[in-house]
Curated annotation (Swiss-Prot):
It comes from the Eukaryota. Sorting nexin, involved in the separation or division of vacuoles throughout the entire life cycle of the cells. Involved in retrieval of late-Golgi SNAREs from post-Golgi endosomes to the trans-Golgi network, for cytoplasm to vacuole transport (Cvt), and autophagy of large cargos including mitophagy, pexophagy and glycophagy. Required for the switch to necrotrophic growth. Belongs to the sorting nexin family. Gene3D superfamilies: Arfaptin homology (AH) domain/BAR domain, Phox-like domain. The PX domain binds phosphatidylinositol 3-phosphate which is necessary for peripheral membrane localization to the perivacuolar punctate structures. Its main location: cytoplasm. Residues 1-56, 459-478 are annotated as: Disordered. This is Sorting nexin-4. The gene is ATG24. It comes from Colletotrichum higginsianum (strain IMI 349063) (Crucifer anthracnose fungus). Disruption phenotype: Abrogates mitophagy. Decreases formation of secondary hyphae. Decreases colony growth and reduces conidial production. Decreases virulence on A.thaliana.
């Protein structure tokens, strides 16, 4: 059943971070009403979302420069440069730079998930979700996409009021001897796993049984969160398809422009009389193709990846909601079992046979006791004493489960508010970056072709075939 030993409960030793969470982030509300008010603030809420805007410590991380290391050996891997600017007093310097590989990020994620079970820890990019990338896992397409995803992972951690203060995160961002930290924590983790191994089977049994049990009373707040998360996933999936189609078309147009420029270059040998005009025209087309390449890299490599990463983050929130529901199911199952034992005890006290059972089952039990020569009164007292012991134990367990469930509810409400705030900041940043790339592309294309027109007009005014007026193309190549 759902009777859970105190030492086997994964959340029995959890620090619920009530004071720390509230002090760390005032925008994290504890009620759905306050959270809705935060959402309705609209654009004004963005100002308070920025790190350090409310006077708290700044933690700004930048992931860049993927580097292939140990090339040519079986231990080849890619490391990423992490540059951190912070005002946290726990850091030795305000700016630090370290290199970390993907397995280091995995270790950090697992450590945070273990240390903060009541938090929706942002997920890492899944290795199996990179099949759409051309080339191998050491190619620039793959490593640049992963760098963008790792950047979003650290951004989410830096915006979370509790996770941003985690010691393991600070060590990850600064320590020059990270491998030693991983080894020491792995040893401690394996030791604690051995200590608690006796309860593994019981926990698995409880989880398996409760997996088929649903909560009887549903909290409207979390039902609404689940519905909104499902709607978010649906919308993101639609947007992802459209953006992927846009990226493919940008790539096709880029290839068409390159082919067009190549064909005009071939035309020069056939029409030497317009060599200068054709060369400038071909160069302008080629520069436009380079601009499309940059635009496609932002659309496909960064923005499209952000949509997939947000879907994964939404899934992490749903997992937390499921864990919250599991805590509620545990409490309801314990309460149901307690009520059953209470009814059995009351039936015994009312004198409904030594078994405490009524109906056909009670009569059958009494006949069996008669055949065995059991003293009915002694059997009744023994069963009543056993039921009293069970009731006392179940009462304690039910009260503890209720407290755990209520605390978990409060933490999940805070996590939902944090998720919405982080999502809002990320959407604003990603959409802003996409808009900036579009503006930059069209500004540069306008400059390229205006330069070409001016160059051609100047040639027409001079009446000679100038060879020195180069339109401001080629700038995109730089």
């Amino acid at each position: 059943m759902a009777v859970i030993d105190q030492h086997q409960d994964d959340f029995s030793n959890v620090s619920w971070n009530t004071d720390e969470h509230t002090a760390a982030e005032s925008s994290s509300s504890v009620t759905a009403t306050e959270f809705d008010d935060t959402e309705r603030n609209g654009h004004n809420a963005y100002e308070s979302d920025a790190p350090g805007s409310d006077g708290q410590e700044v933690l700004d991380c930048v992931v860049s420069e993927p580097l292939k290391e140990n090339d040519g050996s079986k231990d080849t891997f890619v490391s990423y440069l992490i540059t951190t600017n912070t005002t946290f007093p726990s850091f030795q310097r305000s700016q630090t730079t370290v290199r970390r590989r993907f397995t280091d990020f995995v270790f950090l994620y697992k450590a945070l998930s273990r240390d903060y079970p009541t938090a929706a820890v942002p997920p890492l990019p899944d290795k199996q979700r990179m099949e759409y990338v051309s080339g191998n896992r050491f190619g620039p397409d793959f490593t640049n996409r992963r760098a963008h995803s790792l950047q979003r992972f650290l951004n989410r951690l830096s915006l979370h009021p509790v996770l941003r203060r985690a010691d393991i995160l600070h060590i990850f961002l600064e320590s020059p001897d990270w491998n030693a930290t991983m080894r020491s924590r792995s040893v401690r983790g394996s030791t604690s796993s051995d200590t608690g191994s006796s309860g593994v089977f019981d926990n698995l049994t409880d989880s398996f049984l409760n997996a088929f049990t649903k909560a009887h009373k549903h909290d409207k707040r979390f039902l609404e969160v689940r519905e909104r998360s499902d709607k978010l996933d649906e919308d993101l999936a639609h947007i992802e398809k459209v953006v992927a189609r846009v990226a493919r078309r940008e790539n096709d147009i880029e290839l068409d422009f390159k082919d067009l420029a190549e064909q005009f270059q071939k035309l020069i040998t056939l029409e030497p009389g317009v060599e200068n005009e054709v060369r400038h025209f071909a160069n302008s087309i080629e520069d436009t193709a380079m601009g499309l390449r940059k635009l496609k890299d932002v659309t496909d490599g960064d923005y499209l990846g952000s949509l997939r990463d947000m879907q994964a983050y939404s899934t992490a929130l749903k997992s937390l909601l499921k864990a919250r529901e599991q805590k509620q199911v545990d409490y309801e199952q314990l309460t149901e079992y307690l009520n059953k034992n209470t009814v059995d005890r009351d039936q015994l006290q009312s004198g409904q046979g030594s078994s405490g059972l009524s109906g056909a089952s009670g009569r059958l039990m009494r006949k069996l006791e008669d055949v065995r020569g059991v003293d009915h009164e002694q059997a009744r007292r023994d069963r009543q004493r056993k039921l009293e012991m069970n009731i006392d134990k179940l009462t304690t367990e039910a009260e503890r489960a209720k407290k755990t469930s209520e605390m978990f509810d409060d933490e999940v409400v805070k996590e939902v508010a944090d998720f919405e705030r982080i999502k809002r900041v990320e959407f604003k940043k990603q959409l802003g970056g996409l808009a900036d790339s579009q503006i930059e592309f069209y500004d540069e294309v306008t400059e390229i072709w205006e330069g070409y027109v001016k160059a051609m007009e100047k040639e027409g005014v001079s009446g000679t075939r100038s060879t020195g007026v180069e339109p401001p193309g080629r700038r995109l190549a730089d």
